[in-house]
Amino acid sequence: MAAAPLAGCLVLMPLYLPVVPVTDVHSLPSSAQRLSNVADTIGWPQLVSAVAAQDAALARAGQPPTSIFTGAYGETGALDVLGSGYRLPPVLSGHNTCWMWGPGQASDRTVLVVDALGQLSPYFASCRLLATFNPPYHVQNDWTDLQIGVCTGPVARWNVIWPYLRHYD
């Protein structure tokens, strides 16, 4: 009788604890990879590097981003935690409780967008795709085919559009 809960724990362990080597996570069923909190952290350094590369490219082109807007709290966390060495602009998100932080004093002139082009495009004159990010090791997680883009020409200030950017999906 006691073996059943233990067996259940062992089956679910790879979803919540880093017991599978990162290079082998791709061997799990894709549904398990997408549900795994552990799999969602795979690729954080690479995502931050990819966003920083687009930030630098836009700056070289005379369009330095004035803020970064993400579609989900995971991207916001990765950029906040690992992005300080890149001197990135303020990172904003309308996802879950990130929305409550508000835009602060961040400018909306040129917004580097991570996983939220569709969400921001109604509020800007121009939005375009710059790159598509995929996590390393063929892992299928929430960051698979993640779009990185840029939006310019805001139709209103952050404080005006902010109430419309909140989402809990």
Model-derived features: where do they sit?
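Short active-site oxyanion
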Residues: 64-68, 109-111
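Membrane-proximal, lumen/periplasm-facing interface regions of secretory-pathway glyco-
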Residues: 2-64, 74-77, 81-87, 94-96, ...
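Extended hydrophobic/aromatic segments used for targeting, binding, or gating
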Residues: 84-124
